[in-house]
């Protein structure tokens, strides 16, 4: 992130892994680090956020929504791991339906995109961290 402290507070973020509209793609992401980055962004006094992809944001509602999605994903994956579920069973158990509606609405294309670009890779990335307590740099 780059801050410009003079005049009006801005934050310029990098690529779509931080913010992307309508769905935040999670391929190759470290969800715990992503959550921490979003928390830092939320804590700034920025009134304008310029992501590398997606529209300019003039409030932090989308950031909060993405963080909530990631928090829910990691929490559900952690619970599944604690219950001894495999990755395949965890994929079936994680329920992000309320987020699907917020990000994809009724669009079949956006719903498929949400499943394939957000849910599936996010669960895959969160599982080894929940199971082993460390990040994995492979997809």
What do the predicted segments below correspond to?
Residues 43-45, 56-139:
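Accessory terminal helices/loops
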Residues 1-76:
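Metallo-beta-lactamase
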């Amino acid at each position: 992130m780059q801050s410009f402290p003079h005049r009006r507070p801005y934050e310029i973020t990098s690529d779509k892994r931080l913010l992307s509209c309508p769905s935040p793609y999670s391929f190759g992401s470290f969800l715990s680090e992503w959550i921490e980055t979003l928390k830092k962004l939320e804590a700034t006094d920025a009134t304008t956020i310029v992501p590398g992809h997606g529209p300019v944001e003039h409030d932090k509602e989308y950031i909060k929504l993405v963080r909530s999605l990631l928090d829910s994903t990691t929490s559900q994956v952690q619970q599944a791991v604690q219950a001894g579920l495999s990755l395949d069973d965890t994929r079936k158990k994680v329920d992000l339906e309320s987020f699907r509606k917020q990000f994809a609405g009724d669009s079949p294309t956006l719903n498929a995109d949400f499943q394939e670009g957000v849910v599936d890779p996010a669960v895959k990335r969160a599982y080894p961290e929940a199971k082993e307590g460390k990040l994995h740099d492979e997809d």
